[in-house]
Amino acid sequence: MQDPLLPPDDHRALAGRLDLCHFQDEAPGMAFWHPRGWTLYRLLEAAARAHVLAGGYREVSTPQLLRRAIWERSGHWGAFAGAMFAVGDGPDEAALKPVSCPGHIQIVKRLAPSWRDLPLRIAEFGRVHRDEPGGTLHGLLRLRQFTQDDGHIFCTDDQIADEVARFCRELPAFYARFGFTDVSVALSLRPEQRLGDDAAWDRAERALGDVVAELGVPVDVQPGAGAIYGPKLEFALRDRRGRAWQCGTIQLDFAMPERFDVRYVDAAGERRHVVMLHRALFGSIERFLGVLLEHHGAALPAWLAPEQVAIVPVAARHRPYAERVRGELVGLRVRIDDGDDTLARRVAIAHHDGVPLVAIVGDRDVAGESVAIRARDAQVTLPLVEAITDLRNRCTALADRGAERGE
């Protein structure tokens, strides 16, 4: 249900209107996902998963709860204890993870890689928790529970430039699939509170700066905005109203591999510390979904629409033909609306619900085996076979490009 106090193009109002999710006081900063919203969420997750698996990442899963000792060693306890949900006390004190990187480090230490195994790329769609102040919570854009498309690259010094450049080259094409073509980049440098010495920070900042300079990417340098363990490149998407939303990031980290003593065996048999790159495409799935709604409103790209096609029979006698059309569209997300409302009202409801394609079938369509397809901006009547092909093409355009690299 849409909140009447919100502007109609606010993502929170759209989430209610489109029946995607809701929030309530008993779970502040956490979304209750409805079937339509969960469909959209899973589509975003699947797109990111296809992209990273095609890029040589291996997917893992790490525990939600880790003992305090892990967070002290990573530096998160000292820097962010107030924003972590802690449970227990004494030696059993633990915290829900606000990030997945310490868990990934535990896996890599067990894998004990050699130089032949590097770069080692690990990905996780990890649910994380952060105790954000109540006044800062803002729909899907600022939550206490959310899912990071978290990835880490463990590599050698010599591999840093190639890995960062590869990420930077591929990201614009990934965002373009969702309708974002204006992407800006910021280089965030050492904050006042940080891990590691100045020499390591000099080296890390120089490495990221050299990569973007080599690629010819203009950057906005932001002193003091880096992560506690290293500098980062941040990617902001500009929406249809000119607002910038920070989403993707890649961060260079020499500190955490040293704190956890994460090493690889080089070609000479020596054990050396790995370099760790933290990276994300969306930042969080929930936040990116909110940004999508702020950008597209209810008119999401057809491949992302929770319901892609609404088949509207003119009268009850056209229901069997509508069922036949739906049977030809197996694999798409299709509904039939043969309710008691007028034809015009049912078509309007479909568009109000964000359904991008409406297939209208009446006497002439049944007799001539055709379908009238009404999109958001035009209408065309096609023979049944052509109509099915047209609908499939519209609904799958861009949907299967997740495995393509460097588009």
Short names for language-model regions:
Residues 1-407:
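NTP/phosphate- and nucleic-acid-binding module
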